Amino acid sequence: MATQRASGLLQRLAQGSLVKQILVGLILGILLAWISKPAAEAVGLLGTLFVGALKAVAPVLVLMLVMASIANHQHGQKTNIRPILFLYLLGTFSAALAAVVFSFAFPSTLHLSSSAQDIVPPSGIVEVLRGLLMSMVSNPIDALLNANYIGILVWAVGLGFALRHGNETTKNLVNDMSNAVTFMVKLVIRFAPVGIFGLVSSTLATTGFSTLWGYAHLLVVLIGCMLLVALVVNPLLVFWKIRRNPYPLVFACLRESGVYAFFTRSSAANIPVNMALCEKLNLDRDTYSVSIPLGATINMAGAAITITVLTLAAVHTLGVPVDLPTALLLSVVASLCACGASGVAGGSLLLIPLACNMFGIPNDIAMQVVAVGFIIGVLQDSCETALNSSTDVLFTAAACQAEDERLANNALRS
């Protein structure tokens, strides 16, 4: 009887809401740090183990995921979605640019276990570009061992294109390996509540409760930037496309897509909701049936904001100087990282080390930034997904309505 109860409890823990479990871990960590400082410092080992597991699995995940995605790409699918694709890419880059501006206007700092003396900052854009180029030609084994994500991406893309010409058995093997690594990542993510409990407890025990304000400030910057993109940047892009008041369409998408995505925290799970909204808006079925799933994969404005804000928070914490060209390059890198965020369990957070590489920030410190992201992830991930998913249907509707008006005007002229 006791065994059955124990197995039932474990099953509920394994299948329960990760968001609620992280929230419980966060609260318990705060309480433990408040009640007993020595005990809170002791359970810091749980957080260290969690961050170590993330560090171990992330490089392999990026390699296998990108390689499998390119190798298994299907040829011959012809759709007229260029304007939507352009809006997706422009919107993601605009979000990253807005995040850079927001981060410099309201700089955030984090509590990291390394000082600025550990960092050798790049002197400017030329050195950053040189470092990126040298990272690209790194040995693949060396890139995996040292978590050189630029080198990993180059090898993953190259091998992916090479394997496109391989037989189906090879492609299936690569796909199965990708699924296996993804399973391992999901397994690690299931321990996030325990890791967060350890991280919060030890952090508060060693730095004090003032750390919470630092995270609150970071969260305000993140969510504030996402609101800026949702209510100012995206409406400007939609107005540029349809040449009329964009806000009725913007609010409809936020209300009927964003709210669902906020609670599901999954762009993929929100695809049926977006499809139904597109049908309600009388959009072209052949267009939205392709653009909505595509948007769930590459339209990642929220992820671009998360990557940019957290990377610059680490940069500000470590005192690394950033010039304007480097900040612009970060916007481009964050946009490219964001386009790959959909396939990563844990979302955009595990792609932060890739952006941190630009500034000479070691993988150890970058993974501490990822851990901070998990601490604030209860709200951050929900807001990020709401922005990502609602923007999918918003840009699809804008492009379709603009095309309908163009065809109507041409018909009147003729």
Swiss-Prot record:
> What Gene3D superfamilies would the database entry show?
Sodium:dicarboxylate symporter
Catalytically driven reaction(s): L-serine(in) + Na(+)(in) = L-serine(out) + Na(+)(out); L-threonine(in) + Na(+)(in) = L-threonine(out) + Na(+)(out)
For this UniProt entry, what is the primary localization, expressed as one broad class? membrane
**Domain of life according to the entry:** Bacteria
Read off the PROSITE patterns from this record. NA_DICARBOXYL_SYMP_1
Task: List where the protein spans the membrane.
Answer: 16-36, 46-66, 84-104, 143-163, 180-200, 219-239, 300-320, 332-352
Entry keyword annotation includes Transport = yes
- Give one GO biological process term: serine transport
Could you tell me the keywords of this UniProt record? Answer: Amino-acid transport, Cell inner membrane, Cell membrane, Membrane, Symport, Transmembrane, Transmembrane helix, Transport
Q: What InterPro entries does this protein map onto?
A: Na-dicarboxylate_symporter, Na:dicarbo_symporter_sf, Ser_Thr_transp_SstT
* Coiled coil spans: none
Q: Which Gene Ontology CC terms are recorded?
A: plasma membrane
Q: Which cysteines are joined by disulfide bonds?
A: none
Q: Name one GO molecular function term.
A: neutral L-amino acid:sodium symporter activity
Membrane topology, as annotated: Multi-pass membrane protein
Subcellular compartments? Cell inner membrane
Keyword Transport set for record: yes
- What is this protein's function per UniProt? Involved in the import of serine and threonine into the cell, with the concomitant import of sodium (symport system).
Query: Which family does the similarity line name?
Result: Belongs to the dicarboxylate/amino acid:cation symporter (DAACS) (TC 2.A.23) family.
Q: What is this protein called?
A: Serine/threonine transporter SstT
Q: Which species is the source of this protein?
A: Salmonella dublin (strain CT_02021853)
This protein's encoding gene: sstT
